């Protein structure tokens, strides 16, 4: 069951850089989690064209804290997934 969906749009000097949609499954999307995702993914904005959509799913399954990031681009889909026992660790690892 999807509990919360947040949409965050980055704007730098009036230009739309990336749109991040964060979905939580079996987890409450706290402001701290949203901020951690924003901070990590904002470092990637220099690699993508303006108006790039980024889809993030945070989920909890028993002891598994999982983050999935999907970035559709022209002709490709970039995807990263990390699992650990701590969601903040998973968020840190997904950027790499």
Predicted regions, residues:
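N-terminal, polar/charged subdomain of small-to-medium soluble alpha/beta proteins
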Residues: 2-96
């Amino acid at each position: 069951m999807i509990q919360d969906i947040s949409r965050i749009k980055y704007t730098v000097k009036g230009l739309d850089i990336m749109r991040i949609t964060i979905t939580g499954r079996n987890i409450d999307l706290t402001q701290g989690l949203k901020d951690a995702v924003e901070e990590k993914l904002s470092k990637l904005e220099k690699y993508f064209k303006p108006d790039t959509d980024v889809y993030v799913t945070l989920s909890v399954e028993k002891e598994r804290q999982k983050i999935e990031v999907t970035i559709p681009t022209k002709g490709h889909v970039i995807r990263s997934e990390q699992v650990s026992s701590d969601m903040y660790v998973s968020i840190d690892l997904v950027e790499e």
